[in-house]
Protein backbone atom coordinates (compact mmCIF):
# COMPACT_ATOMS: atom_id res chain seq x y z
CA UNK A 1 0.00 0.00 0.00
CA UNK A 2 2.80 2.43 0.92
CA UNK A 3 4.57 1.66 -2.34
CA UNK A 4 1.30 2.40 -4.19
CA UNK A 5 0.86 5.69 -2.31
CA UNK A 6 4.44 6.68 -3.09
CA UNK A 7 3.98 5.79 -6.78
CA UNK A 8 0.78 7.82 -6.95
CA UNK A 9 2.62 10.76 -5.43
CA UNK A 10 5.42 10.46 -7.98
CA UNK A 11 2.91 10.24 -10.87
CA UNK A 12 1.14 13.37 -9.62
CA UNK A 13 4.51 15.10 -9.43
CA UNK A 14 5.26 14.06 -13.03
CA UNK A 15 1.88 15.37 -14.22
CA UNK A 16 2.37 18.71 -12.47
CA UNK A 17 5.89 19.00 -13.89
CA UNK A 18 4.52 18.58 -17.41
CA UNK A 19 1.83 21.21 -16.78
CA UNK A 20 4.42 23.63 -15.39
CA UNK A 21 6.56 23.04 -18.48
CA UNK A 22 3.57 23.77 -20.76
CA UNK A 23 2.63 26.96 -18.88
CA UNK A 24 6.24 28.20 -18.92
CA UNK A 25 6.45 27.70 -22.69
CA UNK A 26 3.19 29.63 -23.09
CA UNK A 27 4.54 32.41 -20.87
CA UNK A 28 7.80 32.61 -22.83
CA UNK A 29 5.85 32.89 -26.10
CA UNK A 30 3.51 35.53 -24.70
CA UNK A 31 6.44 37.57 -23.34
CA UNK A 32 8.18 37.44 -26.74
CA UNK A 33 5.00 38.62 -28.47
CA UNK A 34 4.53 41.40 -25.90
CA UNK A 35 8.05 42.69 -26.54
CA UNK A 36 7.77 42.38 -30.32
CA UNK A 37 4.42 44.07 -30.96
CA UNK A 38 3.66 47.78 -30.87
CA UNK A 39 -0.11 47.36 -31.28
CA UNK A 40 -1.74 48.63 -28.10
CA UNK A 41 -4.75 46.27 -28.31
CA UNK A 42 -2.55 43.21 -28.88
CA UNK A 43 -0.34 44.19 -25.93
CA UNK A 44 -3.42 44.44 -23.69
CA UNK A 45 -4.63 41.00 -24.79
CA UNK A 46 -1.18 39.47 -24.25
CA UNK A 47 -0.86 41.12 -20.82
CA UNK A 48 -4.20 39.59 -19.80
CA UNK A 49 -3.08 36.17 -21.06
CA UNK A 50 0.19 36.53 -19.12
CA UNK A 51 -1.73 37.21 -15.91
CA UNK A 52 -3.73 33.99 -16.44
CA UNK A 53 -0.56 31.99 -17.14
CA UNK A 54 1.23 33.38 -14.06
CA UNK A 55 -1.81 32.59 -11.94
CA UNK A 56 -1.88 29.00 -13.23
CA UNK A 57 1.86 28.65 -12.58
CA UNK A 58 1.43 29.86 -9.01
CA UNK A 59 -1.36 27.33 -8.38
CA UNK A 60 0.71 24.50 -9.87
CA UNK A 61 3.75 25.43 -7.77
CA UNK A 62 1.59 25.51 -4.62
CA UNK A 63 0.23 22.06 -5.48
CA UNK A 64 3.77 20.78 -6.01
CA UNK A 65 4.89 22.30 -2.70
CA UNK A 66 2.09 20.41 -0.95
CA UNK A 67 3.28 17.18 -2.59
CA UNK A 68 6.86 17.84 -1.46
CA UNK A 69 5.54 18.38 2.06
CA UNK A 70 3.76 15.00 2.11
CA UNK A 71 6.43 13.36 4.27
CA UNK A 72 4.01 10.98 6.05
CA UNK A 73 3.70 8.73 2.99
CA UNK A 74 7.43 7.97 3.20
CA UNK A 75 7.42 7.10 6.92
CA UNK A 76 7.29 3.63 8.45
CA UNK A 77 3.87 1.93 8.35
CA UNK A 78 3.95 0.65 11.95
CA UNK A 79 2.07 2.26 14.81
CA UNK A 80 5.36 3.44 16.32
CA UNK A 81 5.40 7.04 17.50
CA UNK A 82 8.48 8.67 16.00
CA UNK A 83 9.28 12.19 14.91
CA UNK A 84 8.89 12.07 11.09
CA UNK A 85 11.94 12.56 8.91
CA UNK A 86 12.13 14.76 5.80
CA UNK A 87 12.64 12.78 2.56
CA UNK A 88 13.09 14.14 -0.97
CA UNK A 89 11.05 13.32 -4.04
CA UNK A 90 12.85 12.10 -7.15
CA UNK A 91 13.71 14.38 -10.03
CA UNK A 92 11.53 13.60 -13.07
CA UNK A 93 12.94 13.29 -16.59
CA UNK A 94 11.46 13.09 -20.07
CA UNK A 95 11.70 9.99 -22.21
CA UNK A 96 14.75 10.09 -24.45
CA UNK A 97 15.60 8.09 -27.57
CA UNK A 98 19.32 7.99 -28.27
CA UNK A 99 19.07 5.33 -30.98
CA UNK A 100 19.57 7.51 -34.08
CA UNK A 101 22.21 9.72 -32.46
CA UNK A 102 24.30 6.73 -31.32
CA UNK A 103 23.99 4.91 -34.65
CA UNK A 104 25.05 8.03 -36.57
CA UNK A 105 28.06 8.48 -34.31
CA UNK A 106 29.07 4.82 -34.76
CA UNK A 107 28.91 5.24 -38.54
CA UNK A 108 30.74 8.58 -38.79
CA UNK A 109 33.26 8.22 -35.96
CA UNK A 110 34.04 4.51 -35.89
CA UNK A 111 33.16 3.67 -39.53
CA UNK A 112 31.04 0.76 -38.39
CA UNK A 113 27.46 -0.34 -39.14
CA UNK A 114 25.21 1.17 -36.47
CA UNK A 115 22.53 -1.51 -36.88
CA UNK A 116 24.92 -4.09 -35.44
CA UNK A 117 24.43 -2.47 -32.04
CA UNK A 118 20.61 -2.34 -31.99
CA UNK A 119 20.41 -4.81 -29.10
CA UNK A 120 22.92 -2.94 -26.88
CA UNK A 121 21.28 0.42 -27.61
CA UNK A 122 17.83 -0.98 -26.82
CA UNK A 123 19.09 -2.48 -23.53
CA UNK A 124 20.61 0.86 -22.57
CA UNK A 125 17.35 2.69 -23.36
CA UNK A 126 15.39 0.11 -21.32
CA UNK A 127 17.79 0.70 -18.42
CA UNK A 128 17.21 4.46 -18.62
CA UNK A 129 13.45 3.94 -18.67
CA UNK A 130 13.62 1.63 -15.63
CA UNK A 131 15.77 4.00 -13.56
CA UNK A 132 13.05 6.69 -13.81
CA UNK A 133 10.94 4.74 -11.29
CA UNK A 134 13.32 2.89 -8.93
CA UNK A 135 11.93 0.89 -6.01
CA UNK A 136 12.49 2.27 -2.52
CA UNK A 137 15.02 -0.41 -1.62
CA UNK A 138 18.60 -1.50 -2.19
CA UNK A 139 17.47 -2.84 -5.58
CA UNK A 140 16.40 0.69 -6.56
CA UNK A 141 19.79 2.06 -5.51
CA UNK A 142 21.56 -0.65 -7.51
CA UNK A 143 19.47 0.21 -10.57
CA UNK A 144 20.45 3.89 -10.36
CA UNK A 145 24.07 2.96 -9.72
CA UNK A 146 24.11 0.62 -12.72
CA UNK A 147 22.78 3.36 -15.00
CA UNK A 148 25.22 5.90 -13.51
CA UNK A 149 28.13 3.55 -14.22
CA UNK A 150 26.95 2.97 -17.78
CA UNK A 151 26.99 6.74 -18.34
CA UNK A 152 30.75 6.68 -17.75
CA UNK A 153 31.23 4.30 -20.69
CA UNK A 154 28.68 6.18 -22.81
CA UNK A 155 30.56 9.42 -22.15
CA UNK A 156 33.90 7.99 -23.22
CA UNK A 157 32.54 6.12 -26.26
CA UNK A 158 30.15 8.64 -27.77
CA UNK A 159 30.67 12.14 -26.33
CA UNK A 160 33.79 13.84 -27.76
CA UNK A 161 35.00 16.77 -25.62
CA UNK A 162 34.62 19.44 -28.31
CA UNK A 163 31.49 18.33 -30.14
CA UNK A 164 28.10 17.62 -28.53
CA UNK A 165 26.16 14.57 -29.66
CA UNK A 166 23.07 16.57 -30.57
CA UNK A 167 20.69 15.25 -27.90
CA UNK A 168 19.18 17.17 -25.00
CA UNK A 169 18.71 15.76 -21.50
CA UNK A 170 15.53 17.12 -19.90
CA UNK A 171 15.09 17.05 -16.11
CA UNK A 172 12.62 18.76 -13.79
CA UNK A 173 13.57 20.49 -10.54
CA UNK A 174 12.64 18.17 -7.66
CA UNK A 175 10.94 20.93 -5.65
CA UNK A 176 9.69 23.57 -8.11
CA UNK A 177 9.06 21.40 -11.18
CA UNK A 178 10.83 23.94 -13.40
CA UNK A 179 12.28 22.12 -16.44
CA UNK A 180 15.95 22.33 -17.42
CA UNK A 181 17.78 20.84 -20.36
CA UNK A 182 21.42 20.52 -21.37
CA UNK A 183 23.40 18.68 -23.99
CA UNK A 184 26.15 17.85 -21.50
CA UNK A 185 26.09 14.29 -20.21
CA UNK A 186 27.33 15.69 -16.88
CA UNK A 187 23.79 17.02 -16.31
CA UNK A 188 22.40 13.51 -16.75
CA UNK A 189 25.02 12.11 -14.36
CA UNK A 190 24.37 14.79 -11.76
CA UNK A 191 20.60 14.27 -11.91
CA UNK A 192 20.95 10.50 -11.47
CA UNK A 193 23.28 11.03 -8.50
CA UNK A 194 20.77 13.48 -7.01
CA UNK A 195 18.04 10.84 -7.34
CA UNK A 196 20.33 8.34 -5.62
CA UNK A 197 20.59 10.72 -2.66
CA UNK A 198 16.82 11.35 -2.73
CA UNK A 199 16.12 7.60 -2.74
CA UNK A 200 18.43 7.14 0.25
CA UNK A 201 16.39 9.78 2.13
CA UNK A 202 13.21 7.81 1.39
CA UNK A 203 14.84 4.56 2.56
CA UNK A 204 15.99 6.28 5.76
CA UNK A 205 12.55 7.78 6.43
CA UNK A 206 10.71 4.44 6.12
CA UNK A 207 12.74 2.60 8.80
CA UNK A 208 11.23 1.50 12.10
CA UNK A 209 13.34 3.57 14.46
CA UNK A 210 12.04 1.83 17.58
CA UNK A 211 14.55 -0.96 16.94
CA UNK A 212 18.34 -0.60 16.99
CA UNK A 213 18.54 -2.35 13.62
CA UNK A 214 16.06 0.12 12.10
CA UNK A 215 17.92 3.11 13.53
CA UNK A 216 21.24 1.78 12.20
CA UNK A 217 19.74 1.37 8.72
CA UNK A 218 18.32 4.91 8.87
CA UNK A 219 21.71 6.32 9.96
CA UNK A 220 23.42 4.52 7.10
CA UNK A 221 20.86 5.76 4.55
CA UNK A 222 20.97 9.41 5.65
CA UNK A 223 24.78 9.35 5.73
CA UNK A 224 24.86 8.01 2.17
CA UNK A 225 22.34 10.66 1.09
CA UNK A 226 24.60 13.33 2.60
CA UNK A 227 27.53 11.80 0.72
CA UNK A 228 25.66 11.97 -2.61
CA UNK A 229 24.71 15.62 -2.13
CA UNK A 230 28.18 16.53 -0.87
CA UNK A 231 29.83 14.89 -3.89
CA UNK A 232 27.46 16.77 -6.20
CA UNK A 233 28.26 20.06 -4.48
CA UNK A 234 32.01 19.53 -4.84
CA UNK A 235 32.05 18.13 -8.38
CA UNK A 236 29.07 19.56 -10.27
CA UNK A 237 29.23 23.24 -11.20
CA UNK A 238 26.98 25.54 -13.25
CA UNK A 239 23.82 23.67 -12.29
CA UNK A 240 20.86 24.66 -14.49
CA UNK A 241 18.31 23.88 -11.74
CA UNK A 242 18.01 25.26 -8.22
CA UNK A 243 17.91 21.84 -6.54
CA UNK A 244 21.48 21.19 -7.72
CA UNK A 245 22.84 24.64 -6.87
CA UNK A 246 25.58 24.97 -4.25
CA UNK A 247 23.28 26.69 -1.75
CA UNK A 248 20.57 24.02 -2.00
CA UNK A 249 23.01 21.11 -1.84
CA UNK A 250 24.74 22.63 1.21
CA UNK A 251 21.35 22.87 2.91
CA UNK A 252 20.52 19.25 2.01
CA UNK A 253 23.85 18.00 3.38
CA UNK A 254 23.21 19.80 6.68
CA UNK A 255 19.65 18.45 6.82
CA UNK A 256 20.87 14.88 6.31
CA UNK A 257 23.57 15.31 8.98
CA UNK A 258 20.91 16.62 11.39
CA UNK A 259 18.69 13.61 10.71
CA UNK A 260 21.67 11.31 11.33
CA UNK A 261 22.27 13.07 14.66
CA UNK A 262 18.60 12.62 15.56
CA UNK A 263 18.89 8.88 14.85
CA UNK A 264 22.04 8.69 17.01
CA UNK A 265 20.08 10.21 19.90
CA UNK A 266 17.24 7.72 19.37
CA UNK A 267 19.73 4.84 19.33
CA UNK A 268 21.30 6.05 22.59
CA UNK A 269 17.88 6.13 24.29
CA UNK A 270 17.02 2.67 22.91
CA UNK A 271 20.28 1.14 24.15
CA UNK A 272 19.99 2.64 27.64
CA UNK A 273 16.51 1.74 28.93
CA UNK A 274 17.72 1.49 32.53
CA UNK A 275 19.15 4.93 33.01
CA UNK A 276 21.38 6.21 35.78
CA UNK A 277 22.61 9.71 36.61
CA UNK A 278 25.39 9.74 34.01
CA UNK A 279 23.23 8.19 31.28
CA UNK A 280 20.57 10.87 31.78
CA UNK A 281 23.22 13.59 31.60
CA UNK A 282 24.56 12.14 28.37
CA UNK A 283 21.02 11.84 26.95
CA UNK A 284 20.52 15.53 27.73
CA UNK A 285 23.77 16.42 25.95
CA UNK A 286 22.88 14.24 22.94
CA UNK A 287 19.49 15.98 22.69
CA UNK A 288 21.24 19.36 22.93
CA UNK A 289 23.51 18.29 20.08
CA UNK A 290 20.47 17.44 17.91
CA UNK A 291 18.96 20.81 18.78
CA UNK A 292 22.15 22.58 17.73
CA UNK A 293 22.40 20.92 14.31
CA UNK A 294 18.71 21.53 13.56
CA UNK A 295 19.14 25.17 14.57
CA UNK A 296 21.98 25.42 12.05
CA UNK A 297 19.78 23.83 9.35
CA UNK A 298 16.96 26.27 10.19
CA UNK A 299 19.30 29.24 9.82
CA UNK A 300 20.41 27.89 6.43
CA UNK A 301 16.81 27.39 5.33
CA UNK A 302 15.80 30.93 6.26
CA UNK A 303 18.57 32.60 4.25
CA UNK A 304 18.12 33.54 0.57
CA UNK A 305 18.14 31.98 -1.98
CA UNK A 306 17.16 28.78 -0.14
CA UNK A 307 14.40 30.56 1.81
CA UNK A 308 12.40 31.32 -1.34
CA UNK A 309 12.95 27.85 -2.79
CA UNK A 310 12.17 25.17 -0.21
CA UNK A 311 8.64 24.36 1.05
CA UNK A 312 7.62 26.45 4.07
CA UNK A 313 6.63 23.23 5.86
CA UNK A 314 10.26 22.02 5.73
CA UNK A 315 11.71 25.04 7.50
CA UNK A 316 8.82 24.98 9.99
CA UNK A 317 9.38 21.29 10.78
CA UNK A 318 13.10 21.87 11.27
CA UNK A 319 12.31 24.78 13.62
CA UNK A 320 9.85 22.57 15.52
CA UNK A 321 12.50 19.85 15.87
CA UNK A 322 15.07 22.33 17.19
CA UNK A 323 12.70 23.46 19.96
CA UNK A 324 11.50 19.89 20.61
CA UNK A 325 15.01 18.56 21.22
CA UNK A 326 15.96 21.58 23.31
CA UNK A 327 12.98 20.72 25.51
CA UNK A 328 14.09 17.08 25.71
CA UNK A 329 17.61 18.10 26.75
CA UNK A 330 16.22 20.01 29.74
CA UNK A 331 13.81 17.16 30.55
CA UNK A 332 16.66 14.62 30.77
CA UNK A 333 18.70 17.06 32.87
CA UNK A 334 15.80 17.28 35.32
CA UNK A 335 15.51 13.47 35.42
CA UNK A 336 19.22 13.18 36.27
CA UNK A 337 18.83 15.61 39.16
CA UNK A 338 15.51 14.44 40.58
CA UNK A 339 15.51 10.67 40.02
CA UNK A 340 18.97 9.82 41.35
CA UNK A 341 20.52 10.75 44.71
CA UNK A 342 24.13 10.37 45.79
CA UNK A 343 25.11 7.36 47.89
CA UNK A 344 28.79 7.72 48.70
CA UNK A 345 31.55 10.30 48.82
CA UNK A 346 33.26 8.78 45.78
CA UNK A 347 29.99 8.95 43.84
CA UNK A 348 29.55 12.61 44.83
CA UNK A 349 32.98 13.48 43.45
CA UNK A 350 32.32 11.62 40.20
CA UNK A 351 28.93 13.29 39.77
CA UNK A 352 30.38 16.69 40.63
CA UNK A 353 33.11 16.31 38.01
CA UNK A 354 30.57 15.37 35.33
CA UNK A 355 28.06 18.03 36.34
CA UNK A 356 30.66 20.82 36.51
CA UNK A 357 31.03 20.48 32.71
CA UNK A 358 27.31 19.99 32.03
CA UNK A 359 26.08 23.58 31.73
CA UNK A 360 27.26 26.30 29.37
CA UNK A 361 27.22 28.71 32.32
CA UNK A 362 27.23 27.79 36.01
CA UNK A 363 23.75 27.79 37.64
CA UNK A 364 23.01 30.68 39.98
CA UNK A 365 23.17 29.89 43.68
CA UNK A 366 25.18 27.31 45.63
CA UNK A 367 28.18 25.45 44.25
CA UNK A 368 27.77 22.30 42.16
CA UNK A 369 29.03 20.09 44.99
CA UNK A 370 26.49 21.48 47.46
CA UNK A 371 23.62 21.18 44.94
CA UNK A 372 24.36 17.53 44.26
CA UNK A 373 24.57 16.61 47.96
CA UNK A 374 21.44 18.51 49.00
CA UNK A 375 18.18 16.83 47.82
CA UNK A 376 16.25 20.10 48.05
CA UNK A 377 18.78 21.99 45.90
CA UNK A 378 18.73 19.15 43.35
CA UNK A 379 14.95 19.41 43.22
CA UNK A 380 15.08 23.19 42.76
CA UNK A 381 17.51 22.98 39.85
CA UNK A 382 15.57 20.06 38.36
CA UNK A 383 12.39 22.12 38.62
CA UNK A 384 14.10 24.97 36.75
CA UNK A 385 15.10 22.58 33.96
CA UNK A 386 11.55 21.20 33.75
CA UNK A 387 10.10 24.70 33.61
CA UNK A 388 12.35 25.46 30.63
CA UNK A 389 11.48 22.10 29.04
CA UNK A 390 7.76 22.87 29.26
CA UNK A 391 8.30 26.34 27.76
CA UNK A 392 10.23 24.84 24.82
CA UNK A 393 7.60 22.11 24.30
CA UNK A 394 4.93 24.79 24.11
CA UNK A 395 7.05 26.84 21.72
CA UNK A 396 7.44 23.79 19.46
CA UNK A 397 3.66 23.27 19.50
CA UNK A 398 3.07 26.96 18.72
CA UNK A 399 5.42 26.86 15.71
CA UNK A 400 3.82 23.60 14.54
CA UNK A 401 0.41 25.29 14.33
CA UNK A 402 1.78 27.98 11.98
CA UNK A 403 2.03 25.54 9.07
CA UNK A 404 -1.22 24.39 7.49
CA UNK A 405 0.46 21.25 6.14
CA UNK A 406 2.09 20.32 9.47
CA UNK A 407 -1.27 20.70 11.25
CA UNK A 408 -2.49 17.77 9.14
CA UNK A 409 0.48 15.64 10.22
CA UNK A 410 -1.02 13.60 13.06
CA UNK A 411 2.17 11.73 13.94
CA UNK A 412 4.14 14.93 14.63
CA UNK A 413 1.29 16.39 16.68
CA UNK A 414 1.15 13.16 18.69
CA UNK A 415 4.89 13.23 19.47
CA UNK A 416 4.79 16.88 20.57
CA UNK A 417 1.73 16.32 22.77
CA UNK A 418 3.18 13.17 24.34
CA UNK A 419 6.52 14.75 25.29
CA UNK A 420 4.77 17.88 26.59
CA UNK A 421 2.55 15.76 28.87
CA UNK A 422 5.63 13.83 30.00
CA UNK A 423 7.34 17.02 31.18
CA UNK A 424 4.15 18.35 32.81
CA UNK A 425 3.72 15.07 34.69
CA UNK A 426 7.31 15.17 35.91
CA UNK A 427 6.91 18.79 37.01
CA UNK A 428 3.76 17.99 39.01
CA UNK A 429 5.60 15.08 40.69
CA UNK A 430 8.36 17.32 42.09
CA UNK A 431 6.28 20.48 42.68
CA UNK A 432 5.35 20.98 46.34
CA UNK A 433 2.47 23.10 47.62
CA UNK A 434 4.76 24.80 50.13
CA UNK A 435 7.19 25.96 47.41
CA UNK A 436 7.34 29.74 47.78
CA UNK A 437 10.68 30.25 46.07
CA UNK A 438 10.79 31.64 42.56
CA UNK A 439 12.01 29.02 40.10
CA UNK A 440 15.30 30.21 38.62
CA UNK A 441 16.41 30.22 35.01
CA UNK A 442 18.01 26.92 34.01
CA UNK A 443 21.25 27.45 32.07
CA UNK A 444 21.68 25.92 28.63
CA UNK A 445 23.26 22.49 28.41
CA UNK A 446 26.81 22.06 27.18
CA UNK A 447 27.07 19.86 24.10
CA UNK A 448 28.82 16.54 24.45
CA UNK A 449 31.85 16.38 22.18
CA UNK A 450 35.31 14.85 22.25
CA UNK A 451 38.27 16.78 23.71
CA UNK A 452 35.86 18.97 25.69
CA UNK A 453 38.39 19.29 28.52
CA UNK A 454 40.83 21.11 26.26
CA UNK A 455 38.72 24.22 26.77
CA UNK A 456 36.74 26.59 24.53
CA UNK A 457 37.55 26.09 20.86
CA UNK A 458 37.74 29.84 20.25
CA UNK A 459 40.87 29.96 22.45
CA UNK A 460 42.35 26.45 22.55
CA UNK A 461 42.59 25.71 18.84
CA UNK A 462 45.27 24.62 16.39
CA UNK A 463 45.60 28.10 14.90
CA UNK A 464 47.06 29.44 18.18
CA UNK A 465 50.55 28.53 19.39
CA UNK A 466 50.74 27.21 22.95
CA UNK A 467 53.56 26.39 25.34
CA UNK A 468 53.27 23.81 28.15
CA UNK A 469 51.37 25.17 31.19
CA UNK A 470 53.56 27.14 33.60
CA UNK A 471 53.14 25.98 37.20
CA UNK A 472 53.57 28.72 39.82
CA UNK A 473 52.99 28.97 43.55
CA UNK A 474 51.47 32.22 44.81
CA UNK A 475 51.23 33.50 48.36
CA UNK A 476 48.82 36.26 49.22
CA UNK A 477 50.48 39.58 50.08
CA UNK A 478 49.20 43.03 51.04
CA UNK A 479 48.04 43.60 47.47
CA UNK A 480 46.53 40.13 47.11
CA UNK A 481 48.21 37.91 44.56
CA UNK A 482 49.50 40.84 42.53
CA UNK A 483 47.38 40.54 39.39
CA UNK A 484 44.00 41.51 37.98
CA UNK A 485 41.71 39.11 36.14
CA UNK A 486 39.26 39.57 33.29
CA UNK A 487 36.85 37.45 31.24
CA UNK A 488 35.35 33.99 31.47
CA UNK A 489 36.20 30.50 30.23
CA UNK A 490 39.16 30.84 30.41
CA UNK A 491 39.96 33.71 32.78
CA UNK A 492 42.65 36.08 31.51
CA UNK A 493 45.42 37.72 33.57
CA UNK A 494 44.69 41.31 32.52
CA UNK A 495 47.40 43.09 34.53
CA UNK A 496 50.43 42.42 36.75
CA UNK A 497 51.27 44.57 39.79
CA UNK A 498 55.02 45.48 39.63
CA UNK A 499 56.92 43.83 42.47
CA UNK A 500 53.93 41.75 43.46
CA UNK A 501 53.74 38.02 44.12
CA UNK A 502 52.60 37.17 40.56
CA UNK A 503 55.39 39.26 38.99
CA UNK A 504 58.03 37.55 41.14
CA UNK A 505 56.64 34.12 40.20
CA UNK A 506 56.96 34.96 36.50
CA UNK A 507 53.26 35.23 35.60
CA UNK A 508 52.85 37.21 32.36
CA UNK A 509 50.10 39.57 31.29
CA UNK A 510 47.55 38.09 28.84
CA UNK A 511 48.16 34.60 30.20
CA UNK A 512 45.17 32.29 30.72
CA UNK A 513 44.61 30.53 34.05
CA UNK A 514 43.94 26.86 33.28
CA UNK A 515 44.20 25.35 36.76
CA UNK A 516 43.80 26.45 40.40
CA UNK A 517 44.87 24.07 43.19
CA UNK A 518 44.83 21.17 40.72
CA UNK A 519 41.26 21.86 39.55
CA UNK A 520 40.89 22.47 35.81
CA UNK A 521 39.33 25.87 35.13
CA UNK A 522 39.50 26.27 31.35
CA UNK A 523 35.69 26.51 31.32
CA UNK A 524 35.37 28.35 34.65
CA UNK A 525 33.60 31.69 35.07
CA UNK A 526 35.42 34.76 36.41
CA UNK A 527 33.62 34.61 39.77
CA UNK A 528 34.47 30.92 40.22
CA UNK A 529 38.21 31.47 39.73
CA UNK A 530 38.19 34.51 42.04
CA UNK A 531 36.42 32.46 44.73
CA UNK A 532 38.95 29.61 44.37
CA UNK A 533 41.80 32.09 44.87
CA UNK A 534 40.07 33.67 47.88
CA UNK A 535 39.67 30.23 49.45
CA UNK A 536 43.46 29.74 49.42
CA UNK A 537 44.93 29.28 52.89
CA UNK A 538 48.07 30.71 54.47
CA UNK A 539 50.23 28.31 52.47
CA UNK A 540 49.15 30.01 49.25
CA UNK A 541 47.81 28.47 46.05
CA UNK A 542 49.23 26.59 43.07
CA UNK A 543 48.05 27.74 39.65
CA UNK A 544 48.85 26.86 36.04
CA UNK A 545 48.92 29.51 33.32
CA UNK A 546 49.50 29.36 29.56
What residue ranges belong to the model's regions?
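Non-transmembrane amphipathic alpha-helical segments
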Residues: 16, 23-33, 53, 60, ...
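Membrane translocator/pore-forming domains, dominated by Gram-negative outer-membrane beta-barrels
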Residues: 241-284, 293-304, 308-309, 332
Amino acid sequence: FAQTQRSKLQHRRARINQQINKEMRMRAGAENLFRATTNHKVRETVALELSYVNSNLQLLKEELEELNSSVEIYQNESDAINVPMIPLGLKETKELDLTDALKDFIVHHYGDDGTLYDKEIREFMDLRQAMRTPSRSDAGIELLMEYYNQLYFLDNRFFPPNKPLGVFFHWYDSLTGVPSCQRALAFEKGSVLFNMGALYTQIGARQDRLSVEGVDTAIDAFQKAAGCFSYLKENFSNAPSLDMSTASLSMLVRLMVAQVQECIFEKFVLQNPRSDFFTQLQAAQEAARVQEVYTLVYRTMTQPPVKDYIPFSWSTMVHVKAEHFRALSHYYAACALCDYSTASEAEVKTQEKAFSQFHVTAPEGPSVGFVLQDPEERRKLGKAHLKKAIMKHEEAMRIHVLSKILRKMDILQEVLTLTHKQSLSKYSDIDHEEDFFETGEAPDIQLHFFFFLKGPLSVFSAKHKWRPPQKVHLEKGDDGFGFTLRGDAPVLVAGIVPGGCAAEAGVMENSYIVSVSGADCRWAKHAQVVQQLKDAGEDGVDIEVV
